């Protein structure tokens, strides 16, 4: 599915330009950019692409920064601050996003940060703006984006931060899945798309041998590493895109609360990717435990990948599934 905002920005990704790329941008787009910072890990990232939580490299300045509006407000404000930091005086920020995605609010903040020199064009529900850095910057409030902060969850201390979906609360689906997997896990466990590590911590309370927590989000890896530090002797935290770099058939159990949005869009292909990777990674006699919104048709989507699909529970708009009997899927 083509993203109109990305298409508007592509002609500007050339020359002395820094691309700030979240999940909206493809690997190919990141590779084409001469300079890129992304908070989403992909396999085979070249040296020209920095994977981090939108942290500026030292002593670098650019004449242009290109940015597609992100979904989370704190990420937007962090990227605006980063763009202002990385631009030379009179350099330009080129930004695009949808009218229903918050682009108008973002442009108001950008004017406050960069100065009033802005050119905006309208494109069928989307806006493209070119903003010149005309003044010394005073950073806008990005909710202390770079800082981990403590969450108390039923007496347990966790750490999280902006840049993660639901970073300041426990997802209800994850709570339901934790109850479902109680006393069900052993051996090797994979938390696929671990977020800030809530499911991983629940798994570590059981009699398991090892746990791998993987995510493609830089903020998730920072938080999970902190949350799982007491169990470092049997935990591996992996920067990975949906298990692509992990060896097949190595996990007794996989636990997963998969995303069903990529940026602003609901992506069935993303759900299928998680299902297919789960089938590749789990052992022949292993189980995959999923929790999803009830409107996601897991039984139909998983039919191609698993012989057994057991609907365990429906509660508060979420479905818990136990998938087993993984099939060998053609590439």
Please place each PLM-identified region on the residue numbering.
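N-terminal auxiliary segments of SAM/dcSAM-dependent transferases
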Residues: 75-151
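Conserved proline-anchored active-site loop of SAM-dependent methyltransferases
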Residues: 64-74, 192-197, 251-264, 278
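Short glycine-centered segments of the SAM/dcSAM-binding site in methyltransferase folds
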Residues: 91-92, 285-287
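Conserved SAM/SAH cofactor-binding pocket of Class I
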Residues: 1-46, 172-247, 253-256
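C-terminal catalytic and target-recognition region of SAM-dependent MTase-like enzymes
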Residues: 288-331
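A short, conserved alpha-helix within the catalytic core of class I
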Residues: 73-81, 264-274
């Amino acid at each position: 599915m083509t993203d109109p905002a990305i298409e508007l920005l592509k002609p500007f990704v050339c020359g002395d330009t820094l691309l700030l790329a979240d999940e909206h941008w493809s690997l190919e787009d990141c590779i084409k950019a001469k300079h890129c910072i992304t908070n989403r890990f992909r396999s085979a990232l070249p040296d020209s692409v920095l994977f981090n939580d939108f942290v500026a490299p030292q002593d670098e300045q650019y004449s242009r920064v290109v940015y597609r509006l992100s979904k989370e407000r704190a990420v937007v404000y962090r990227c605006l601050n980063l763009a202002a930091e990385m631009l030379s005086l009179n350099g330009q920020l080129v930004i695009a996003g949808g009218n229903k995605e918050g682009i108008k609010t973002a442009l108001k903040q950008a004017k406050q940060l960069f100065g009033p020199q802005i050119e905006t064009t309208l494109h069928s529900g989307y806006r493209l703006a070119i903003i010149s850095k005309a003044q010394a910057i005073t950073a806008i409030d990005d909710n202390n984006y770079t800082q981990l902060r403590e969450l108390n969850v039923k007496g347990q201390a966790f750490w999280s931060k902006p840049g993660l979906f639901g970073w300041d609360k426990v997802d209800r689906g994850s709570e339901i899945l934790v109850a479902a997997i109680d006393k069900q896990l052993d051996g090797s466990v994979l938390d696929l798309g671990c977020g800030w590590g809530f499911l991983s911590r629940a798994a570590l309370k059981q009699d398991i041998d090892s746990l791998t927590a993987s995510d493609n989000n830089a903020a998730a890896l920072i938080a999970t590493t902190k949350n799982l530090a007491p169990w470092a002797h049997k935990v591996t935290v992996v920067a990975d895109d949906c298990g692509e770099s992990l060896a097949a058939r190595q996990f007794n159990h996989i636990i997963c609360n998969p995303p069903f949005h990529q940026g602003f869009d609901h992506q069935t292909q993303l759900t299928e990717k998680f299902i297919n990777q789960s089938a590749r990674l789990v052992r022949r006699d292993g189980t995959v435990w999923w929790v999803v919104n009830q409107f996601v048709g897991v039984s139909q989507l998983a039919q191609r990948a698993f012989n057994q699909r057991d609907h365990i529970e429906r509660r508060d708009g979420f479905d818990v599934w136990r998938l087993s009997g993984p099939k060998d899927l053609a590439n």
